Structure formats: structure tokens, C-alpha cells
Amino acid sequence: MDPIAELAKFDRETVAQAKAVEQRIQAEGLAAGHTIRDVRVFRVLMPWVGTKRWDGSAENFTFAEFETDKGLVGIAEGANADAKELKGNVLGKNPFDPSIRADMGLAYWDLIGKIADRPLGQYLHELFALETPLAERVPMSAYTWYRFPDLNGENAVTFESYPSYVQEIIRTHGFQNIKLSMCDFEPQHYVELVLNIRAAVGSDVDIRVDPHASWGEAQALRFMREVEDCHLEWIEEPVGGRFAHIFRAGHRLRLLSTIPISSHAWLPPLVSHPSPKGRYGDDALDAELDLDALRRWQPADISAPDAYAGPLALKRHYDAARFLGLGIGMHSAYELGPATAIRLHIAAFTFPYEMPYHIVWGRDRAFPPFSAHAIDAHYNQWADDVICGGKMAYDQGFLAVPKGPGLGVELDPERLRHYAFSEEKAAAHTRHIEQIRATHLDALGWRVERGGWRRYRRR
């Protein structure tokens, strides 16, 4: 049997097991007999530390609390901001009614853990009857980027100060893994920056880079060859476009450079759009692997999907990736406490495995050694959080997996009030970023326009 056919057989078994777990969760949730009696929706405007390049100085979030008639409260991040519509959809219904799965989002997982009286990761670890250990803490990669000053003129990170800034967050939080967001400058400037940062942090700190699929294949190859001596952990999808183009470029670059490539789009397919079950809905369990693409390309060394796919979908995805000998990671979007918590729970039960002491010859389905990577996170860049106790604390660059039932975190009413969204606050941030965008190409030293031609400078 060829390797892809073997993978397909293994994947069918994995999906069958995941669907059996999904059905058990659904049955246990419905049998608990809860009814949603109240829904509270909160809009929040959370500032970044500094201003995230020309993107913005704050981000808008929507949270919801779903309270049941038995006194449990499930929390969701990324909820429907239309409180009236959300209440109309869910009030009076069982939170595990399949018709409202998309409305529940993250709260679905928070509530099932609370009903089971288990931290979510432990609950899922038990349902899958895993023999591998359950992690108590998860290594995090510190996301970094060029920062313009915030509204108070503070917390800038420039090309010149970037290496000392990285040294500072390593000293403060113990990070052992740094991620460089790399669409702020033109590609050639990043060669110098990576060399400077590697010299500043030494050889013990892992460095990964992400051009956000903003480069051409030739640009990516030139960069990769010039920084090979820096021993990067990975470069994430340097080339964009249609998935077929991303996969083809990744495949070619892997043959031309020793730097590993990470992808959150490989293995295909991963997520269906739009997702009928909403965020964390595990829709990808119903999508078959693209066997033609798997036979045609090998575009990545590390598979790092988004947690939005759902815990069961990621379990399936990671098992398939490891079957093919890929490393595994987890991509980051913009997450505050509740969404960070589920990422920690997913990593805690899906990532760990027992490394063999000796080489294993011919053993079926033996996972490759050293395949688990620190997970991406924007979390270190937020000014605060809206969970009780504030931001989770880093310890040697790790975050502890929350120990309470469900997600193990709760929303803090005071912080929700302090960071409540208002048009006035949003307008101030909008004015600030518009001023930056008017001059950002000059500030960042760009020689070309965003369209690619040399800049025409008016006299």
C-alpha cells in the first residue's frame, strides 16, 4: 500500500473515533438537561502594547455569557455582537441543541467541561482514552513586530531597537521561542534584522519568522539562503495566492533551502468556509483529505492549524500530520483569555507523546521525535485581558493550562467595564492609525509602493 493510501486508511479510523467522541459529548450535554435562561453580551476594545505596525492600536472583541437554569455559565469569545438576535436564537433551548451550535461557539466547550466537572483538556484526554501524558503547561512563542507608538507616544519598537526589545521580553517572561512578523519592511531588510536578533539572543532561543504569505517565491528563496546560518526554527508560508500556488511554492522552496516551512493550510482540507457549526465546531471532521494534493506536493515540514477548527478536528489533523512525519504547531489569530484557554487545553491533550529511547524500525504509526513545537500567540502583545486575575502569567515562556472546570477562566466584570467598546474610544484609535498610514512607507524605509513599483517621490 502506498503511503497516502495508508494515511487515508489511518485517517478514516481517526475520524471514526473522533465522531464517536463527538456523539458522546453531545449525548452527555443533552442528558444533563440544562436550559439557557439568560445571555449577556459584552463588546470590548482591547489596546495593543504600542501600535501593531499600520494595522491598529486596539482590537474589537465580543464576549458572551450563556447562563443555564441550573446555574452554570458558559463563556464565548468571538460571539455574535447582536445581543437581540443571539438571545432570540438560544433562550429556552438546551445549550447542546445542534441547531444552536454555531451560536454557542466557545461556550459549548466551556459548558461540557463544567457539566463533567473537568478541565476541558483532561475531559477530552479521558474520552479518547489516551495513554500519552496530559500536559500541565504549554510552551508559547512570543509574537513580535514593528510597533509604532501608542496613543500616548509610547511603546514603539523600531528596526534599531528590535534586538534589545526581544532581549527584554526574554528576561521578563522567560520566552525560549520568538516569532518575527515580517511584512513591515521590504524583504531585504529582514536579513539584517534576523542576523541582529540571532546575535542578540544567542543560539538557545528558537526563532521562527512569518512573512504572512506576502512574498514572491524568488524573494523568499533569497531571504532563506541568506539567513540559513541563523538556524531558524521555521519560516511560515512565505508565498501567498491560491492554495495550489502556496503548496507548489512551498514544495519547491523545501527542495532549495534547509529552513523548515510551517503551514496552517496543510494538510488539506482543514476548515470549511463558511463553517455551519461556527467557531470550534469541528466541521472539518466531515471533510475528506485531499489525496491528490497530498500525492502531488510536500510543501511543509510543520503543520500548524488554527484552533478555530475545533478540538476534535485538530486531534484528527495532528494525528494525520504525525503519520506523515510532520511536526505540529498551532497558528494564532487574535485571542484573549477564553480563546487562549481552549488553545492551551487542545495542546495539552493532543501534543504530548512518548519519545522512544531508541530507533524504532518498521513500527506502525510511530510519531517522529521532536515533532511538537511551541504554539503561536499574540497574547504577549495585549495591554491586558478581560478574565478574572488579568493576563495569564508566563513562566519560562510557558503558560499553565487552566485547572478549573471547562475552560477554567471566567470573565471579570470590572475589566469588561473598563475596556467596554465605545464609538468615542474607537474613533481615537481610528484617527491614530490613519495618521500612521499616511506616512508609514516613509517611516519604514520602503523603496517601492505596495503595488510593487518603485515609489514616485513628489518634490
Role assignments for model-derived ranges:
Residues 89, 93, 231, 243-398, ...:
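Shared catalytic-loop signature of beta/alpha-barrel
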Residues 2-208, 212-221, 225-229, 256, ...:
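N-terminal capping/lid subdomain adjacent to the active-site entrance of alpha/beta enzymes
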Residues 142-144, 180-182, 209-213, 236-239, ...:
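A cross-domain feature marking catalytic cores of carbohydrate-active enzymes
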